Amino acid sequence: MPTDRVPAADLKDLFGQVSHEVRIQVLAELWDADEQTLSFSTLRERVGVRDSGNFNYHLGSLTPELLRRDKNGYTLTYAGRQVVGAAVAGSYTDATELDVGNVDAGACPSCGGRVDTVYEDGDVVMDCRGCGDLIARLPAPPVVIAAHDADALPRVVSDHFQTQSARLTRGFCKLCDGPVTATPTVATDRDALTNPPELDVTFTCQACGDITHLNVGVVTLHFPELRAFLHETGVDIRDCYLWELDFLLKPNVSVSEDPFRAEIVVTVDDEALALTVDDSLALVGYERR
């Protein structure tokens, strides 16, 4: 069943739930409790509110969406943990203050030159030092960057991007977990996450409205048929960065209409695998060549 997008008015109500410092402190104390249930009196003492009536009002404003109440007291709901988790994701430092310098991120698939990685404005940007190509620009929260040494940044970013793209291809929004629809976009001139491909895939969340564009090569990477082919031909995606895989950045794509079909051919040495997808990006056929 289709999910209606959350109206802006409802978002204002949700933001209002955590707009008071007492409510924020309640969430923080329950987070620190490590899923332990805290009684009303214990929670009020930890938050530091003397007026029990006023404190009960704030708890009521957070329940049941963000807090779960039972006979023993209060715990965070899944949504409550997500609110705190979102704060943690960006709390290590302002994204503009994270300076990891230029980090070696492997070889350029076009010229073989060194790929440099920098973190700017919440994105990991990879450019080739040799030919000057923009290899990829991938979003990453500050916690991903701040929690790892600079030398580990390329590996972490590659794994993080695989995780995010896998969620999308399995039908979950990367922001709110709502259902997403996948739509192919042919011959677009919009800048993709990687080099502009012949075929983009647009993922649209039916709940929050978030839109993500991936090239079709990244989408096909999550098909088990392609993973098996790569394994058989000696390509282990755990030992390389995604942007080093030429077929991901510059997929070999042919498109036909009525009905819509897109064929993506992945070649490794003398072996090739042709994958055919429909207008929902579901795999409808594959062939070794």
PLM region spans:
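Short alpha-helical segments that sit at the start of domains
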Residues: 2-25
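Short acidic, hydrophobic short linear motifs in intrinsically disordered regions
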Residues: 26, 34-47
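A short, conserved structural fragment
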Residues: 63-72
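Short Cys/His-rich "knuckle" micro-motifs
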Residues: 70, 116-122, 138-142, 180-187, ...
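Basic, amphipathic "hinge/linker" alpha-helix immediately C-terminal to the N-terminal HTH DNA-binding motif
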Residues: 72-90
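Short, flexible, mixed-charge glycine/proline-rich loop motifs
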Residues: 93-105, 116-122, 159-170, 194-199
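Short cysteine-rich clusters marking metal-coordination/redox-active sites
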Residues: 108-112, 128-131, 173-176, 205-208
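C-terminal regulatory/effector modules of DNA-binding transcriptional regulators
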Residues: 150-151, 162-289
